[in-house]
Each structure stands twice: as structure tokens, then as C-alpha cells.
């Protein structure tokens, strides 16, 4: 079991924040409020941002900030306990208590809100409400036109209902409960059938929900579609066929060449580019190890990359790769290092 710590391995730039309050938000869901020890202002963040939480064993987990970005004296995250996950959510639920100090990273945003759109469509599945809730707060402050569709198994499984109630009363937030059968819930395909110029779409949730959203918005312009996956979700690579990011069958060995020195290193099928670089003294910052956060992104100069991240746009993939999950379709990749 992984144990959060303020004395373990984490960057020197991490923030030591105190847990001021923990609130129950639904079945298996707790919200955690972090503040500075001196009660001062925290670094500002934008809607859709996340922070890293650091564990004793060096592992890192990302959690979306879900409070109003205008608030400067607290960070709020919500954590769904997953007994079949990698241990992070269990550690937080069982070991993080009020008044404890926790190492928290600075806010980063890979899922930004595009402001100024004539209409914003937000789709949340389960705990995927977290980044979208922050967007709702921002859109409310702007007086922007938006609709949030929040899908959950039941009311008991939906977080932040009391806080979202005023928006629901105005018809801005619409709840959809399917009893555990998505076929009885929101018809995502029907909802996304309509697109108007300038509209922006955002979605976040579990794998099946994400797949349904992705398949339903293929006619939307790429620049109008924004999404954020969780760890363990299936990825749609270049050919559109779902894969498992960690598939050994597809993790073929290849070589990487360091452009600045000409050094050639072999990446075996059981190691990532980031791991091999680290073993040879070439440190590339890493965080999620799952192609979610972009911390380990580097530029490549030559080679045919098999991208397995959830983050990079088609344009970005022509220049960058994520060293934690990307592989090579050919014999060699040349990295701009």
C-alpha cells in the first residue's frame, strides 16, 4: 500500500500543504481541501488544472482541482476509492486525515477551458466531474453559455450535488442516473449529433464513457473537442484501434539516438524510453508514467513514433513524444536531447 508523506521522495519545489477538511461526497468519494500552513494564498490555477500528489515510494498520482479557480486560499480535489487500482486512492482514503501535511505539486493544465466560445458542452462520467466542476465555476463567473451533463450510477454515486444545485435549478447542469446500465442513461450519440460553429466540447470519465463520447463526436472539428482520461483508460492510437498502453505484445525493442552526443541506446520491450534514459544518466522529468500529464515530453528529430499518450494533439505528435509510453514503429528514434 502506498503511503502519502511530507518527508518522502518528492521534488524540492513541491508544496507542503495541510489537509484542512475532508468531506464525504458520495459512495467511495471523498473531497480533500488543502491549504497553506500559514493560511496564505496559493498559486493560482485555471479551470481543468491538476496537481500531483507524491507518495513515500516515489510514485506520483494526478488529481484535478475542482474548486472555483478564483479561490486563492485552498485547493480541492476529490478521490474515488478504487480497490482494483494501483493503490493511490486506497492510501489517500485510509491514511490522509485532517491536519496532515501532504506533498503537493504546483498546478498544471493539460485540459484548459477555451474561453469565449458561443456555447460550451461539458460531459462528466462519475468522478470525471472533477475538472469539469472547476470549469462550471469559471463559466458561471463569466456569464457564459454552457450545459453540463453529469452521468452517474445513482444520486448516491454523484459528487458535489449540493454545490451544483443552483446551476441545476437554472438548467445549466443536468443529472443522468442509469442504475449501472449505460443504455438507460444519457444518449451521448444523440446529444452530440448537433454541432454549431464555435461550440466547444469537454468530456472526462471512465473508459466506456470516454469511448462513447469519442465515437459520438467524430463529426466535430478536432479543435473543438477536448478530453481528459484517467489512468488505466484505453487509448485510441493512430489507427483508431483500442490498445492497452502497457501491452508487452506491442512494446517491441528499438534504439534511441541522442542527437547532441550521437549515443545510441537500446530500449528493450519491457522498459520505457524514460527508464532507459535514466539508467544512462540522462534524466527526463516524469510524473504519471501513463502518458497523461506531459511531464516527460521530449522533441524527436527522426523516426516513426507509436504514440500511446492521451495528451498530445495530432500536430504535437509530429514533433514530440512522451518518453513514459511512446514506442518506435521502426528501428531507431532520434531524440533532441
Curated annotation (Swiss-Prot):
Q: Which organism is it from?
A: Aquincola tertiaricarbonis
An MF annotation (GO) of this entry: metal ion binding
**All residue ranges annotated as the FAD-binding FR-type domain in the record:** 9-114
Q: Tell me what turns on expression of this protein.
A: Induced in the presence of tert-butyl alcohol (TBA).
What cofactors does the UniProt entry give for this protein? [2Fe-2S] cluster
Signal sequence extent: none
Q: Which gene encodes it?
A: mdpK
Looking up InterPro entries in the UniProt record yields:
2Fe-2S_ferredoxin-like_sf (IPR036010), 2Fe-2S_ferredoxin-type (IPR001041), 2Fe2S_fd_BS (IPR006058), Beta-grasp_dom_sf (IPR012675), FAD-bd_FR_type (IPR017927), FNR_nucleotide-bd (IPR039261), MRET (IPR050415), OxRdtase_FAD/NAD-bd (IPR001433)
Q: Which residues form a coiled coil?
A: none
Quaternary structure per UniProt? Answer: This two-component enzyme is composed of an oxygenase (MdpJ) and a reductase (MdpK).
Q: Please share the entry's free-text remark on the cofactor.
A: Binds 1 2Fe-2S cluster.
* Name used for this protein in its record: Tert-butanol monooxygenase / tert-amyl alcohol desaturase reductase subunit
EC code(s) of this entry: 1.-.-.-
Annotated residues that bind [2Fe-2S] cluster are located at 288, 293, 296, 324
- Pfam families named in the record: Fer2 (PF00111), NAD_binding_1 (PF00175)
Recite the UniProt keywords alphabetically. 2Fe-2S, Electron transport, Flavoprotein, Iron, Iron-sulfur, Metal-binding, Oxidoreductase, Transport
Q: Which family does it belong to?
A: Belongs to the PDR/VanB family.
Functional description taken from the UniProt entry? Reductase component of a two-component system involved in the degradation of tertiary alcohols such as tert-butyl alcohol (TBA) and tert-amyl alcohol (TAA). MdpK probably provides electrons via its [2Fe-2S] iron-sulfur cluster to the MdpJ oxygenase subunit.
Q: In this protein, which residues make up the domain named 2Fe-2S ferredoxin-type?
A: 254-337
